[in-house]
Design a protein with these regions (language model features):
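Non-catalytic all-alpha helical scaffold/repeat segments
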Residues: 1-250
């Protein structure tokens, strides 16, 4: 399979090949048969770029559904060293309705946490301030999943949502999680962890002040659990601020 996939990738710029329905069918079957393992494979990166391109430029729902099921199983086998970013961003946006049932089942399953670990930074916010692909589509699928699986989905979603809307307030997603599931300690812990995952260059004091401003804005939240959590976060940030100021002065 790998030598054949290598041949296809070497000719990936010959888009006219995929205009032949028979060739296109063979290529897609080859993609679905491609072995994804823990072993580093030099083809993995090019494979991911090629598959992403096919998904973006095509409209084959059956292929997208089959690919989603394949990746759920393959990504769950162990930590993958290959870079497969790009594929799931397209799947959860363009083919959302097609893949959702299988995706949702895997997302909330403890047996498929390896799969979630592999994709969460790509389709979530990761270490950036942006909005991940999972949250770029304006529908109720993620919210409904959280309500359907309140013991599993919210704490996982909380790790992936965008934290800030602007320089002064938390994002709508962040506020929704607090409003709906702020009575769950696991969810609050996940939100706390999410606030601490940013990649930041230079002094972190501006980031700490940004967090403090957002937290001060929800000190009077209707949930007592959230109010207590806010106080805990503020105390922690104030300690971080003092430590950082002392370090910079030194």
């Amino acid at each position: 399979i790998k030598p054949l996939m290598g041949f296809v990738l070497n000719h990936r710029y010959h888009r006219e090949l995929l205009e032949d329905s028979n060739v296109c069918k063979i290529v897609k079957q080859l993609i679905l048969s491609y072995p994804i393992t823990e072993e580093t494979n030099n083809l993995d990166y090019e494979y991911a770029r090629y598959v992403t391109d096919i998904l973006e430029k095509g409209n084959d729902n059956d292929f997208a559904a089959d690919l989603n099921r394949k990746l759920i199983e393959d990504f769950n086998k162990g930590y993958l060293h290959g870079n497969f970013d790009g594929i799931y961003s397209v799947l959860v946006k363009k083919y959302r309705d097609v893949i959702w049932d299988d995706f949702e089942s895997a997302f909330v399953s403890d047996d498929y946490y390896g799969f979630l670990f592999q994709i969460k930074d790509e389709i979530g916010s990761g270490t950036s301030f942006g909005v991940g692909a999972l949250f770029q589509v304006k529908d109720d699928k993620v919210q409904n999943m959280c309500k359907k699986y309140p013991g599993k989905a919210p704490l996982r979603v909380a790790q992936m949502i965008p934290v800030f809307k602007d320089g002064h307030t938390f994002s709508d997603w962040f506020m929704w999680m607090l409003d709906e599931f702020g009575d769950q300690k696991d969810v609050l812990d996940s939100l706390h962890a999410n606030m601490g995952t940013f990649t930041w260059g230079g002094s972190i004091i501006p980031l700490l002040r940004k967090k403090m401003e957002c937290l001060n804005g929800i000190k009077n939240h209707r949930r007592v659990e959230v109010r207590e959590w806010v106080e805990m976060c503020l105390q922690e940030i104030e300690e971080d601020m003092r430590r950082e100021l002392n370090r910079e002065e030194y």
